[in-house]
């Protein structure tokens, strides 16, 4: 099989991912396998991810996911092994990092330690090809960042981030307020489709003239939803969901488009789990069109955590002839977003 075969493992939170991609001689990527096993059902009754349960689930799921991926890709061993090194849950990361190092050593192939958040940005390469200079809006359960990305191989510049709750975290908290359970992203998105986004106008945090134009705040929005629900016992859940979702999408897209136009950058990339949200995608498409920006968003399957995105970032490192990471590099639960490769 021509090209360089890269196998990557993702275990930063509650999804066990194994992705296998082929880096072609011309730099293009061919995704050969994308296996994901989620432990979300085991966390539902706790209303959020329990780190110990997530770690044990990774231990149980990784071996079978690896075998399925190798079979699907039709290979016996890859040319390169990569893994998420951080950020994420400490125990969950250790499972994937230890496994990836063991596989790399046993197969005698190079090992690359990859930033989970950089992987989210790289996932779009499967959809739209090499990433040009862009402003990236990275939105997930634990992170909300605006980044200036010149290329995947250069250090990213953080333009702003949330000062409190991440966007995905706000979704989960509002879903609990409405009695919708965990996780909240998809269920709120689905419910909002039958609601009126103009029926309840919730506040847009950090949008005043004196506020940081690239910073975000969703704690006040969450509190506003809680106060509304308490004051209106007969509230219509679909309208609350629609109003909340409209506020989130409005702030995210408004600030991202403004950042791109302000920097004179012609491309906006939206990545991370929240990028799968239908209203965010719709409003971003509209506002980028109005601003003359090219919008890049991966398909929803590639927005959530997976091994394919880690393989994509590792492929960029291999193509750039970056030195492999040492096998003694430790996992880093608090790894900053601006650092793509570790070691």
Swiss-Prot record:
The processes (GO biological process) annotated in the record are:
tRNA threonylcarbamoyladenosine modification
Q: Which NCBIfam families match?
A: gcp_kae1, T6A_TsaD_YgjD
Q: What is this protein called?
A: tRNA N6-adenosine threonylcarbamoyltransferase
The cofactor binding remark recorded in the entry reads: Binds 1 Fe(2+) ion per subunit.
> Which Cys-Cys disulfides exist here?
none
Q: Which family does it belong to?
A: Belongs to the KAE1 / TsaD family.
What compartments host this protein? Cytoplasm
Q: Which Pfam families match?
A: TsaD
Record's GO cellular component, any one? cytoplasm
Q: Which residues bind Fe cation?
A: 116, 120, 305
**Record keywords:** Acyltransferase, Cytoplasm, Iron, Metal-binding, Transferase, tRNA processing
């Amino acid at each position: 099989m021509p090209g360089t075969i890269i196998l990557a493992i993702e275990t930063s939170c509650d999804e066990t991912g194994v992705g296998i991609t082929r880096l072609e001689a011309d730099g293009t990527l061919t995704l050969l396998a994308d296996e994901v096993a989620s432990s979300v059902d085991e966390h539902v009754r706790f209303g959020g991810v329990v780190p110990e349960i997530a770690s044990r689930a990774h231990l149980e799921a990784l071996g079978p996911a690896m075998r399925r991926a190798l079979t699907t890709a039709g290979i016996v061993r890859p040319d390169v092994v990569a893994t998420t090194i951080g950020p994420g849950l400490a125990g969950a990361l250790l499972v994937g990092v230890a496994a990836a190092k063991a596989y790399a050593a046993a197969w005698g192939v190079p090992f690359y330690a990859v930033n989970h958040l950089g992987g989210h940005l790289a996932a779009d390469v499967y959809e739209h090809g090499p990433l040009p200079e862009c402003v990236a809006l990275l939105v997930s359960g634990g992170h909300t960042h605006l980044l200036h990305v010149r290329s995947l191989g250069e250090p990213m510049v953080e333009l702003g981030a949330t000062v409190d709750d991440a966007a995905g975290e706000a979704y989960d908290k509002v879903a609990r307020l409405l009695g919708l359970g965990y996780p909240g992203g998809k269920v709120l998105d689905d419910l909002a489709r039958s609601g009126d986004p103009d029926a309840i106008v919730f506040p847009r945090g950090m949008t005043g003239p004196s506020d940081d134009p690239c910073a975000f705040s969703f704690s006040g929005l969450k509190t506003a939803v809680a106060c509304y629900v308490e004051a209106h016992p007969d509230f219509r859940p679909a309208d609350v969901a629609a109003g909340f979702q409209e506020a989130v999408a409005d702030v995210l897209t408004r600030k991202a488009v403004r950042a791109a136009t302000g920097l004179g950058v012609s491309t906006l990339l939206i990545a991370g789990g929240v990028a799968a949200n239908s209203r965010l995608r719709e409003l971003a498409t509209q506002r980028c069109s109005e601003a003359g920006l090219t919008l890049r968003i991966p398909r929803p399957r590639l927005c959530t955590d997976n091994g394919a995105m880690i393989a994509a970032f590792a492929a960029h490192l291999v193509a750039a002839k970056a030195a492999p990471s040492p096998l003694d590099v430790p996992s880093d639960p608090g790894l900053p977003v601006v650092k793509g490769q570790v070691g």
